[in-house]
Amino acid sequence: MSSIPAGTDPGSCGANFKNDRKRRDKINDRIQELLSIIPKDFFRDYYGNSGSNDTLSESTPGALGLSSKAKGTGTKDGKPNKGQILTQAVEYISHLQNQVDTQNREEVELMVKATQLAKQTGTIVNDINLENTSAEVALSRIGVGPLAATNDDSVRPPAKRLSSFEYGGYGEYGNGS
């Protein structure tokens, strides 16, 4: 009697192992890529106090109740382990999302100010899109976000400029007569 379950090919075990190994290697490579992309500031706790201006150092055992080993390091070389890298990747993405939200709010405020100034001065502002934020327009181009479902021409990028000036080119507004 064989110890291999019925219906399995003894040669397929090696192939499964190779495929599994290849899959794990890909995952590990991507995790290391994340580690290289995420700013080191997000790993301050995992690398210890190196590079910071804190008065406490790694040579002070028991500082703040921590042992001399860096907080939660799962590797022998003191680098963050896979779980910590993934956790910090999520933190970094959240940080970036907050930055985008802040910039969107600032952009909306500037758009409101631009329309108010245009009304006060009687100036026509047609070289910027005052309907949607630049983030909304950019996301709609890749099929994501609140404007992704709209396939009509209501979402357009800013009008093509007629002059080489970024803003204030009088050629954009005709000859003035």
Swiss-Prot record:
Taxonomic superkingdom: Eukaryota
Localization per record: Nucleus
PANTHER family reported in the protein's UniProt record: FI24210P1
Residue positions where Phosphothreonine is found in the record: 60
Keyword Cytoplasm: no
Protein name: Retrograde regulation protein 1
Record PTM Phosphoserine, positions in chain: 50, 52
UniProt record, GO biological process: cellular response to oleic acid; mitochondria-nucleus signaling pathway; peroxisome fission; positive regulation of transcription by RNA polymerase II; regulation of transcription by RNA polymerase II
A Pfam family recorded for this sequence: HLH
GO CC aspect terms: cytoplasm; nucleus; transcription regulator complex
Domain bHLH, residue spans: 11-96
Region (Disordered): 1-24, 52-82, 147-177
PROSITE patterns: BHLH
UniProtKB keywords: DNA-binding, Nucleus, Phosphoprotein, Transcription, Transcription regulation
One term of GO molecular function: protein dimerization activity
Described purpose of this protein according to its UniProt entry: Required for a novel path of interorganelle communication between mitochondria, peroxisomes and the nucleus, thereby maintaining a functional metabolic interaction between the tricarboxylic acid and glyoxylate cycles. Transcription factor that regulates CIT2 gene expression. Binds to two identical sites oriented as inverted repeats 28 bp apart in a regulatory upstream activation sequence element (UASR) in the CIT2 promoter. The core binding site is 5'-GGTCAC-3'.
Start-end of Gly residues biased regions: 168-177
Subunit organization: Binds DNA as a heterodimer with RTG3.
